[in-house]
Curated annotation (Swiss-Prot):
Gene label: rplE
Keywords: Ribonucleoprotein, Ribosomal protein, RNA-binding, rRNA-binding, tRNA-binding
Higher taxonomy: Bacteria, Bacillati, Cyanobacteriota, Cyanophyceae, Acaryochloridales
Keyword Oxidoreductase: no
GO molecular-function term, one example from the UniProt record: tRNA binding
Cited NCBIfam families: PRK00010.1 (NF000585)
A single cellular component GO annotation: ribonucleoprotein complex
Protein name: Large ribosomal subunit protein uL5
UniProt-listed Pfam families: Ribosomal_L5 (PF00281), Ribosomal_L5_C (PF00673)
Length: 181
């Protein structure tokens, strides 16, 4: 069973991008390679229960068990010692990546209050896109009553696009709702 967004990419995006950018080789056509979901714990780094809740929430949202990221160096100003947990992250590839992107674009983003589209300026210069979410409640998988605190997350969409223009065209064809400036 192929995911809906993957079939959309193969049937619609590939021919559209090939025509738009005049690619001679099929391997030049940009595609999404991975999606990285990251959440910094901040104050909750001392709280083991908050770490557990974050792990559970990201697992429910992404469908994959997150990895705990740990501090590489001690920073006295932030009361962090080396090896302390500072965040959780998930790297999605393949079918899970397409399923997550589909849910993000079609279910989660439209549920944001006063949503007018995502910023078209959040590209990194190499065709990769990053967006930050302020709350986890926009995902339908998260139960409102089960959360202890509203926490956001960063989502990075890594593509094989060479330029921001190619990356923007790819994500637009896949349904990413960019804001018109």
């Amino acid at each position: 069973m192929t995911v809906r967004l993957k079939t959309l990419y193969l049937d619609t995006a590939v021919p559209k991008l090939q025509e738009q950018f005049k690619y001679k080789n099929a391997h030049e056509i940009p595609k999404v390679t991975k999606v990285s979901v990251n959440r910094g714990l901040g104050e909750a780094s001392q709280n083991a229960k908050a770490l557990e809740r974050s792990l559970e929430e990201l697992a429910v949202i992404t469908g994959q068990r997150p990895v705990v990221t740990r501090a590489k160096k001690a920073i006295a100003g932030f009361k962090i010692r080396q090896g302390m947990p500072v965040g959780v992250m998930v790297t999605l590839r393949g079918e899970r990546m397409y399923a997550f992107l589909d849910r993000l674009v079609n279910l989660a983003l439209p549920r944001i209050r006063d949503f007018r589209g995502v910023s078209p300026k959040s590209f990194d210069g190499r065709g990769n896109y990053t967006l930050g979410l302020r709350e986890q409640l926009i995902f339908p998988e998260v139960d409102y009553d089960s959360i202890d605190q509203i926490r956001g997350m960063d989502i990075s969409i890594i593509t094989t696009a060479k330029t921001d223009e190619e990356g923007r065209a790819l994500l637009k064809v896949l349904g990413m709702p960019f804001r018109e400036n």
